[in-house]
């Protein structure tokens, strides 16, 4: 049986829905020894800021049951070095490269979008709205609908013809209100979800396992939360949703598409097996054929409720 794994996202058709999640796949080059980067639907590089960042002190990762905590602190080489040294070595003509943006205020986000707007090798911009807004007392952009909407608008104005994705935080009371505000502000697509806030402690040393004390929980433990969030957001907005959270198999991919996602991102599973994203992309068409799914468009959002 012949199947069609292609997906159309705003401004870019992709060969399959399997992408990588920011912060779990480096800049893409680090994983080239484990598979063909051209086989992926998209590569979302680790968060980029205007200036290089050293990140948080060690330890920055702690294993948890069914997942992991991280407090990397968005360590990165800075956008200029990425564009000069890393982007030219990526297969951007065959696989869309999505730049994930990190900044401390809306003006900085907009400036970063402007730097990337003319780069031919960058297919889209993903905005990390879990960042604290220093001009608003440190509250995260993603925790306030008004701030989320204004940030999406500010980035969209400077993004040129680049599609803008807004990555939603699950650490909110009502993720749907944030999603709606982001779309009204100009977001072309939504990435759903970022990590959940968590912590881990050592009862013998009486110390936290992370130097930052609190970190972001990811991995299989958060998949039910991510599925619920994607389902709710897809019911509320017309913009495409990219699902992320605990995905480690082709079956997981289809679960997210079943509840409405257009595409998915593989995150923590890349630490379990560095070839995981490649394996899932290879397995997906086989699974679709086994289940009699001819194309993803007809399967998307077909969950039978009631």
UniProtKB/Swiss-Prot annotation:
Its main location: cytoplasm. One of its GO terms (biological process) is 'de novo' pyrimidine nucleobase biosynthetic process. FMN binds at residues 22, 46-47, 100, 128, 167, 193, 219, 245-246, 267-268. It catalyses: (S)-dihydroorotate + NAD(+) = orotate + NADH + H(+). It is found in: Cytoplasm. Belongs to the dihydroorotate dehydrogenase family. Type 1 subfamily. This is Dihydroorotate dehydrogenase B (NAD(+)), catalytic subunit. The lineage of its organism: Bacteria, Pseudomonadati, Thermodesulfobacteriota, Desulfovibrionia, Desulfovibrionales. The gene is pyrD.
């Amino acid at each position: 049986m012949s199947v069609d794994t292609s997906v159309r996202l705003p401004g870019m058709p992709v060969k399959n829905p399997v992408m990588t999640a920011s912060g779990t796949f480096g800049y893409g080059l680090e994983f080239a020894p484990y598979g063909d980067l051209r086989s992926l639907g998209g590569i979302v590089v680790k968060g980029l800021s205007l200036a290089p960042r050293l990140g948080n002190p060690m330890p920055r990762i702690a294993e948890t049951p069914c997942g992991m905590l991280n407090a990397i602190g968005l360590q990165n080489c800075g956008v200029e070095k990425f564009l000069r040294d890393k982007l030219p070595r990526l297969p951007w003509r065959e696989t869309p490269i999505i730049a994930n943006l990190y900044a401390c205020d809306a003006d900085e986000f907009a400036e970063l979008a402007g730097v990337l707007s003319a780069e031919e090798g960058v297919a889209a911009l993903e905005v990390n709205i879990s960042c604290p807004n220093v001009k608003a007392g440190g509250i995260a952009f993603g925790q306030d609908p008004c701030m989320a909407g204004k940030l999406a608008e500010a980035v969209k104005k400077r993004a040129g013809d680049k599609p803008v994705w807004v990555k939603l935080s699950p650490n909110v009371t009502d993720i749907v209100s944030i999603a709606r505000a982001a779309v009204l502000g100009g977001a072309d697509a939504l990435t759903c979800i970022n990590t959940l806030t968590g912590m881990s402690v050592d009862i013998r040393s009486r110390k936290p396992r992370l130097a930052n004390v609190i970190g972001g929980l990811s991995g299989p433990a958060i998949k039910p939360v991510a599925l619920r969030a994607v389902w709710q957001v897809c019911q509320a907005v017309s913009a495409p949703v990219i699902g992320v959270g605990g995905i480690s198999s082709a079956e997981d991919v289809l679960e997210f598409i079943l509840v409405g996602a257009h595409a998915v991102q593989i995150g923590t599973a890349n630490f379990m097996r560095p070839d995981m994203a490649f394996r899932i992309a290879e397995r997906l068409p086989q699974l679709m054929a086994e289940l009699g799914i001819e194309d993803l468009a007809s399967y998307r959002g077909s969950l039978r409720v009631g």
